[in-house]
Amino acid sequence: MSKPASGASVFISVRVAGICALLIVGSAIGCRFLGDGQTLMAALKLVTATLAVGVVPGALATMLWRPRRALTLLEVIGFGVAISFGLVHLIAVLAVSAHVGAPITLGMLAIASTLMAIRTIWRPFGLVVITLDELIVLSLLLALSVFLYNLGSPVTWWEDQVHVSIVRRLSELASPRLDNLYVTPGLVYAYPIPGTHFFMALIARLSDLDPLFVYHK
């Protein structure tokens, strides 16, 4: 599965990375059916859903694209976040233009991620390199993320509450349109394709958490 490399590095095949990606997606789906009454359980549901929507699709696309035979872990994660956000925005355009609800778009994203993972697992070439330096950086980022998670984002201002309402509507609407996203009926929102809101709506729908909690965290 993995072997030590020269220095303080470990090489992991893209096959193993693809299996890990599938496990993350499966965990996100499985955690949906767990209760969220406890703090740790709610955090687990939110984190797995965020990884499944905001990192895994782009990471799999990066490993399929494979600009180099060996990619570092931070490169896979960094490209994964950037590409995943782009994919979510394209899905948001599709959802609003074709009036497709969050459950259908989530299914499309899950199918695409599964197909990319299977293709990645079948590929015999490609490595993900984990170095000690990157593990230190990831540890610091993890510590920062825990602090920011506990701190949360303010939701007391009127503008924040409007954003939360749009996230909630995107997660619940069966037929999203330009004129039904905003809290005022028939009024077109200033951002016709709110990609960031749709990203949070997909996470809320996948994790089965309240959109207010997702926005706050």
What are these regions (language model features)?
Residues 72, 89-93, 101, 136-142, ...:
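Generic detector of bulky aromatic hydrophobic side chains
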Residues 1-130:
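Membrane-embedded, hydrophobic transmembrane alpha-helices
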Residues 133, 140-217:
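Active-site lumenal/periplasmic loops and adjacent helix-entry segments of GT-C-fold
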